């Protein structure tokens, strides 16, 4: 009787390779689903104008959404934000501006501000929901940051955000 380890090794390799290949295929498929959701003509993060803002001792690198198309896209389809990175929404009118999280893949915090940069409201928003997030007060700016950013940095209503561009 001849005994060989070759069939045993082949079965073990197959038992390991199949689950690994399935996991990789699933991960690749998940990533491509999000990539496919970005509509043609949507701006990449680097395509937005950027500005530096201050919140207390923190410097924020903010993409600026100052027109209807940019405000509509906002942070949709983004899979992460760098530390101290966010998006500033600039409105031409002093009003209640509501937000939702449709096609927004990461949870965010939002601060609503008056024309002088004073924060009136801060809210936490869950990814991919259509719940309305509206401030209690009129304003001309909103700043979206990673979830809990304002809380973690000790930024509260009544404080001011500096470096804001003038509303148009």
Which residues does each predicted region cover?
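Bacterial N-terminal signal peptides
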Residues: 11-29
């Amino acid at each position: 009787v001849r005994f060989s380890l070759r069939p045993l090794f082949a079965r073990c390799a197959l038992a390991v390779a199949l689950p690994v290949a399935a996991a990789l295929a699933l991960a690749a498929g998940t990533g491509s689903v999000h990539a496919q959701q970005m509509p043609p003509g949507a701006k990449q993060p680097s395509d937005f104008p950027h500005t530096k803002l201050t919140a207390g001792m923190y410097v924020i690198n903010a993409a600026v959404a100052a027109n209807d198309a940019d405000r509509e896209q906002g942070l949709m389809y983004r899979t992460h934000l760098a530390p101290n990175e966010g998006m500033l929404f600039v409105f031409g009118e002093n009003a209640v501006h509501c937000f939702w999280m449709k096609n927004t893949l990461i949870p965010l915090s939002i601060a609503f501000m008056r024309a002088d940069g004073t924060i009136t409201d801060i809210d936490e928003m869950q990814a991919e929901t259509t719940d309305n997030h509206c401030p209690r007060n009129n304003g001309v700016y909103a700043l979206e940051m990673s979830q809990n950013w304002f809380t973690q940095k000790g930024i509260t209503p009544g404080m001011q955000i500096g470096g804001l561009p003038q509303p148009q």
